[in-house]
Design a protein with these regions (language model features):
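A short beta-loop-alpha structural element at the N-terminal edge
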Residues: 14-30
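A conserved beta-turn-beta hairpin within the catalytic core of GNAT-like acetyltransferases
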Residues: 84-93, 101, 105, 120-124, ...
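Conserved acetyl-CoA-binding loop-helix of GNAT-fold acetyltransferases
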Residues: 103-117, 139-143
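C-terminal "cap" of GNAT-fold acetyltransferases
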Residues: 154-184
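Conserved beta-strand-loop-alpha-helix junction that forms the acyl-donor binding cleft
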Residues: 127-138
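Acetyl-CoA-dependent GNAT
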Residues: 46-93
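Conserved catalytic-core motifs of GNAT/GCN5-like acyltransferases
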Residues: 129, 145-162
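A short, internal acetyl-CoA/4′-phosphopantetheine-binding micro-motif in the GNAT/acyltransferase core
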Residues: 70, 94-106, 131
Length: 184
């Protein structure tokens, strides 16, 4: 059965995902409390210490991977998490990009997540939820082949299978032409 494993770094074409550290807490706090992000994510406690505590607890735990999205040798652009393994499926979320992130960052970071989960961790599907009012994001996922499993309490719940993920990896190959390199 697949399991979610942390990685120190995952390099893509122009982006890298690196494991979060307590030093990233200020960036994460600012990102999560920005007006553009806060409208579409779960509430963030109003103090930075809560974010530091969350990251510290994550580092001690297992069963999740939490990354800072950045240009390969550049400053942080966003965050993404893999969590909630259910058999062959994993959840991903906390996917937040700065408003001024390069246009390719959304597609490439999603491809990196799928490539890591399927090719390196052994998953064959994903599940996640998106707030209904966040049309830009749920439309993005639907273009990748995700299907709405249900909707309730202002959320759409999605599933995407291995065939749809493989089709998206092929369709958007120009954003990740050489796959990924994982450093544990």
């Amino acid at each position: 059965m697949p399991q979610i494993l942390k990685a120190a770094r995952i390099d893509g074409h122009r982006l890298a995902l690196r494991d979060v550290a307590p030093a990233d807490s200020d960036f994460i706090f600012a990102l999560r409390t920005s007006a553009s992000a806060a409208a579409h994510i779960s509430a963030t406690p109003p103090d930075r210490q809560s974010q530091i505590d969350y990251v510290t607890a994550y580092q001690r735990g297992s069963g999740a991977a939490y990354f800072i999205i950045c240009e390969r040798d550049g400053p942080p652009l966003g965050t993404v998490r893999l969590y909630d393994p259910q058999g062959e499926s994993f959840a991903w979320g906390s996917w937040i990009l700065k408003a001024d992130a390069p246009l390719f960052a959304a597609i490439e970071s999603a491809l990196i997540v799928y490539c890591y989960a399927l090719d390196h961790l052994g998953f064959s599907a994903a599940h996640f939820s998106v707030r209904q009012e966040n049309a830009k994001v749920w439309q993005f996922h639907e273009r990748f082949g995700a299907e709405r499993a249900r909707s309730e309490a202002g959320q759409y719940y999605f599933r995407i299978g291995g065939a749809a993920i493989a089709a998206s990896l092929a369709r958007y190959r120009r954003f990740l032409p050489n796959g990924i390199t994982v450093t544990r």
